[in-house]
């Protein structure tokens, strides 16, 4: 605000610094001399102070002029504005000043004691306010520095806490990872132990099974089944040979009957050889030739049986083989005779026992043939062989045959021929 013929210093209170209070001092001084009216009003705050306008001759306030200085601030920026207005009513006023005498000029230019004292008081107050403002600024800067240090400490504390949390999270992660690895290793170790125990138990069970003989019996049973299948195949071949033999024997019987009938002398014997039909007269085919053919077939059957890998030293296989030969009525064959001769004179007691048991299982003594009965006689005369029911049965049968006179045994080399 401005008043005519006066100087006004004003500083409004800033809303941004509530702690800083405004101190206002108003000094008014009025004098009435030489038509001058001086009024000084000073308004100061803790932000600063305004010094009065000093002219070379002292503090002067001219009539018709006004000096207005004030400080204005907004919410975001503070500006200081000083407006000085000099108004002259006319150019004559300055001319009047020139027309005055030097005495009056000297008198008017000398400052009054009251104004000097007022200025001194104003200067002291302004100095005091300035010192107070400096102290407030120092305190404010210290507070700001404390706040900055506190903020830095808080930031450092937060950073350290974040680092601690990160380190703790890493420790927890490593601990969980180590626990998982440890559990996996433990499970693997337990699985390995269980596997080793299972393998050891299985091995012990297999060893116990082998020591008990069950595994060996299983292997022998499987081998026996395989050999039995092979012998069944050989049996089929032998049956085929036996059928051929029976047909040839029946053919010879028919030839003998036809030889007695003169009306059938013209009949011929038809044989097939290598796909060709051969016609022979009844007299052209002799019994020796038929016997040779029969022996050839028996040799074929023996070769088939030997090709199957039959072991004559095995008692079980020997019993099976002898039973098969008895069923086929092939005990008098060449291979059968050699087999019975070798087994009856074998140094192995089990082999001789097996042969005796197989011969005793024959349904009739006539099915044994000469080779079978000769082998049975040799086994009966064996002193080292324990007497069994089969040999006793053979002796009873032999006694019964001898008492009736129904049979006589003649030995021609290795072959025995039965005559009725």
Swiss-Prot record:
* Conditions for induction: Induced by abscisic acid (ABA), salicylate (SA), methyl jasmonate (MeJA) and ethylene.
Note the InterPro entries from the entry: AAF-like
State the compartments where it is located. Answer: Plastid, Chloroplast
Asked if Magnesium is a keyword of the record, the answer is no
List the keywords (alphabetical). Answer: Chloroplast, Plastid, Transit peptide
Disordered: region residues: 85-111
Family the UniProt entry places it in = Belongs to the ATA15/OSA15 family.
This protein's name: Senescence-associated protein SPA15, chloroplastic
Q: Which organism is it from?
A: Ipomoea batatas (Sweet potato)
What broad taxonomic lineage does this protein's source fall under? Eukaryota, Viridiplantae, Streptophyta, Embryophyta, Tracheophyta
What's the name of its gene?
A: SPA15
């Amino acid at each position: 605000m401005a008043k005519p013929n006066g100087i006004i210093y004003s500083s409004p209170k800033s809303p941004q610094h509530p702690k800083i209070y405004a101190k206002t001092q108003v000094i008014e001084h009025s004098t009435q001399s030489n038509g001058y009216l001086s009024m000084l009003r000073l308004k100061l705050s803790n932000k600063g102070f305004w010094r009065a306008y000093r002219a070379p001759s002292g503090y002067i306030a001219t009539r018709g002029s006004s000096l207005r200085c004030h400080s204005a601030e907004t919410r975001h920026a503070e500006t200081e504005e000083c407006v000085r207005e000099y108004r002259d009513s006319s150019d004559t006023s300055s001319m009047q000043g020139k027309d005055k005498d030097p005495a009056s000029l000297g008198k008017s230019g000398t400052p009054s004691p009251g104004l000097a004292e007022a200025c001194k008081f104003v200067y002291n107050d302004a100095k005091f306010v300035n010192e107070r403002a400096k102290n407030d600024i120092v305190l404010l800067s210290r507070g700001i520095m404390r706040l900055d240090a506190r903020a830095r400490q808080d930031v450092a504390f937060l950073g350290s806490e974040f680092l601690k949390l990160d380190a703790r999270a890493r420790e927890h992660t490593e601990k969980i990872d180590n626990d998982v690895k440890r559990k996996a290793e433990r499970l693997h170790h337990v699985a390995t132990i269980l596997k080793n125990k299972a393998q050891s138990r299985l091995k012990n069970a297999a060893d116990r099974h082998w020591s008990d003989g069950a595994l060996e019996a299983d292997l022998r049973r499987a081998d026996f089944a395989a050999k039995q299948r092979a012998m069944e195949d050989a049996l089929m071949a032998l049956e085929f040979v036996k059928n051929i033999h029976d047909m040839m024997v029946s053919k010879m019987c028919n030839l003998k009957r036809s030889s007695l009938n003169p009306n059938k002398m013209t009949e011929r014997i038809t044989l097939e050889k290598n796909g060709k039909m051969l016609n022979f007269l009844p007299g052209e085919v002799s019994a020796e030739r038929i016997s040779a053919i029969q022996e050839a077939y028996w040799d074929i059957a023996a070769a088939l049986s030997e090709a199957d890998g039959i072991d004559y030293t095995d008692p079980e296989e020997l019993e099976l083989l002898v039973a098969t030969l008895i069923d086929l009525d092939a005990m008098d064959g060449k291979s059968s005779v050699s087999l019975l001769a070798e087994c009856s004179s074998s140094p192995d007691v089990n082999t001789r026992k097996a042969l005796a048991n197989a011969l005793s299982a024959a349904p009739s003594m006539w099915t044994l043939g000469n080779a079978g009965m000769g082998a049975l006689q040799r086994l009966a005369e064996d002193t080292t062989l324990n007497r069994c029911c089969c040999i006793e049965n053979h002796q009873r049968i032999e006694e019964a045959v001898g008492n009736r006179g129904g049979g006589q045994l003649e030995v021609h080399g290795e072959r025995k021929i039965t005559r009725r």
